[in-house]
Amino acid sequence: MFSEVEMARDVAICAKHLNGQSPHQPILCRLLQDLIHEKACREHGFYLGITALKSIGNNKNNNIDNENNHQAKILTFPVSFTCRTFLPARGDILQGTVKKVLWNGAFIRSGPLRYAYLSLLKMPHYHYVHSPLSEDEKPHFQKDDLSKIAVGVVVRFQVLAVRFKERPHKRRNDYYVLATLEGNGSFGPISLTGSDEPYM
């Protein structure tokens, strides 16, 4: 689900990057970089964008020594802001583009969600079609009515399970989703071509 949440965190920047200018722009740039590198958190999901900068507190004046033993002044500012987020949850209905087809399932990408796995066991009435290498058609899943799930096809699916993976130092955290087409006649391929990045 999509949300707009208020968040607070400390943003650290090197004093030499200020060059006598207002700290607001460097702080905002650093905050954006941190969110891009972190990508997602367990509580709120994927960070989609900062919608408002609420406040920037006073510098906490931390000093550290760098590797060359020259003292580098690190300024740390408490920042409050609102952020648009996307948290996938069991039962959500999403749509995304098929990126890879294997004999036992397909990987779907939906906006920032790169790893939605749709198992053949969760595709009622579909069967795997392995095309010979000499043919132009790629491997895909197909029903008796000839509807296909193949690379590039946009698929509507329901979230069956969600797993959050937090990486060391919170760099490029990610969500992994199990998808299903069971339980609703509207689930399945909705077009043969579509946006690689559905509107978020």
Curated annotation (Swiss-Prot):
Keywords: DNA-directed RNA polymerase, Nucleus, Transcription. It comes from the Eukaryota. GO terms for molecular function: nucleic acid binding. GO terms for cellular component: DNA-directed RNA polymerase complex; nucleus. SMART domains: S1. Its main location: nucleus. It is found in: Nucleus. InterPro entries: NA-bd_OB-fold, RNA_pol_Rpb7-like_N_sf, Rpb7-like, S1_domain. GO terms for biological process: DNA-templated transcription initiation. Gene3D superfamilies: Nucleic acid-binding proteins, RNA polymerase Rpb7-like, N-terminal domain. Belongs to the eukaryotic RPB7/RPC8 RNA polymerase subunit family. This is DNA-directed RNA polymerase subunit 7-like protein. It comes from Arabidopsis thaliana. The gene is NRPB7L.
